[in-house]
């Protein structure tokens, strides 16, 4: 959410003339008598029924609703989601590179060019049909989690399912959003504002 707010602020502060909408989904995340449990099937803003396989894969549920809102209510013609979503991306890429998924080569290329300008590192991950099959459900439209592997990719593909075919980019910044190394890309220790400058350069053209 911070990257979205900061990018929108930077665009406004620099009077960049671009039509962009930022959505920051938020909710409380705590145990209650009505909390999700494995095996639940819940509805979503996009109309899909979701089988809950793992209650720790909860952040993607509100990202899916935000994605559906962008398409349904804001009529977005291109969509990007960004989140500190999975621990799997840290195991794969470490703390200096963020994961990226996209179904549109031109859109992805434009973003990676912007990222090069910003100095941020992203690595595009592959999308194959068998990975999509990992989140197919027999009792709902989709599962909120696949198996114990390929977690970064299946998390992104879950969100993509709510993009309604719009050109889409998914950024998993779980490893790059915070640093304990004060020398990392010239950043002080702490939050890095990961994604903000890349989004800005993409949208500013």
Predicted segment positions?
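A generic structural signal for tightly packed, nonpolar segments enriched in small/aliphatic residues
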Residues: 1-205
